[in-house]
Amino acid sequence: MAKNFYDITLALAGICQSARLVQSLAHEGTCDSEALHVSLKSVIDQNPASTLDVFGGREAGLKIGLETLLGMLNTSSRQGLGAELTRYTLSLMVLERKLAASKGAMNTLGNRIADLSRQLEHFELESDTLMSAMAGIYVDVISPLGPRIQVNGSPNVLQSPQIQAKVRATLLAGIRAAVLWQQVGGGRLQLMFSRNRLTTQAKQILAQC
């Protein structure tokens, strides 16, 4: 069956967007607020009509992720911030496979996300309450699956409990995108053997943003 590279590229951009937001939060203590909202909201919507609907129905909501994906696909550098982004992205993919292999963890994740949806009726998505709840899901359900993702950044920034919660909530969004990526036919071999196809598709989507 032919792969739908539009959906695959969107989901992959979702993973990359989370990786870029985590990097920005860890080094600078801040990140693009619209991209963060899109990524965090994707965790809540468990019954989307389409892949694009997971990310708010707008390709522009994944602009940072698409740019990050293109940078990763087209760089030969294995050093510095680029290598960091690649490590975060691949680590999220590995954790998703661990999650998929654990029926108990998947069930727990589903229940905890349902609880999140109920909390969203009373709190804003970016509120400390929701951030802490999302971070708690990552710590309780995803981290024990291992291997843990080592986040690099400014020690002063990473000491902040609020930043720690945002980073973990954003990693949870990355897991959500990685689950979606597998669901629409994504796989790590594509990063080696379908780079040109992914690059072309990402450029086409970016042109619409």
Curated annotation (Swiss-Prot):
It is found in: Cytoplasm; Cell inner membrane. Signal peptide: none annotated. One of its GO terms (cellular component) is cytoplasm. Keywords: Cell inner membrane, Cell membrane, Coiled coil, Cytoplasm, Membrane. Pfam families: DUF489. InterPro entries: HflD, HflD-like_sf. It is a peripheral membrane protein. Residues 95-132 form a coiled coil. SUPFAM superfamilies: YcfC-like (SSF101322). The keyword Coiled coil applies. Its main location: cytoplasm. Belongs to the HflD family. This is High frequency lysogenization protein HflD homolog. It comes from Cronobacter sakazakii (strain ATCC BAA-894) (Enterobacter sakazakii).
